[in-house]
């Protein structure tokens, strides 16, 4: 069975089962070869796919020498380190944040009202006051907070907000414009989720990876 036949069968399944799918598309190389929308085609919140864009940008920053996987969180923000900080806090690296093994071992900053600052008006101060429960690097725990901290490390290293850095390194290269991006209470784009994109634009990053890092 070819890709188009599989796509058509999937569309039929979505329709027959009334599955909560807004849109679906497949691409071959740089071209979309099949696309179907079940709601109006518009930019939508891509939620945790945002993490893929931020981690890609961090990879670019590492290649450019702005960061290292061994860069320590506390070195990026020494002013946020509590006077009674745990030894383990100083062991958290960018590598741990990207692999969600920071050691906080809790799904922080994932509550529905986090964008309004409920309970955490300053994400950095909030996370630096959390207890590191296990040794960094020892345990996987899915948490948007790890992504948010990694994003802030990128901002600090690049000297600009995430939106600016990603526009220069990714969005403009993929003809994605300047996407709407939800921010934290202090105006920093949320690295854990919140970019708005159309389906076609959302697909582009996957195409880049499938094409070994090239676009057109």
Summary of predicted features, one role per range:
Residues 47, 140-142:
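Catalytic tyrosine of NAD(P)H-dependent dehydrogenase/reductases that use a Tyr as the general acid/base
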Residues 39, 132-135, 146-148, 184-190:
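Flexible glycine/proline-enriched surface loops and loop-helix/loop-strand junctions
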Residues 149-153, 193-215:
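Active-site-proximal alpha-helical segments within enzyme catalytic domains
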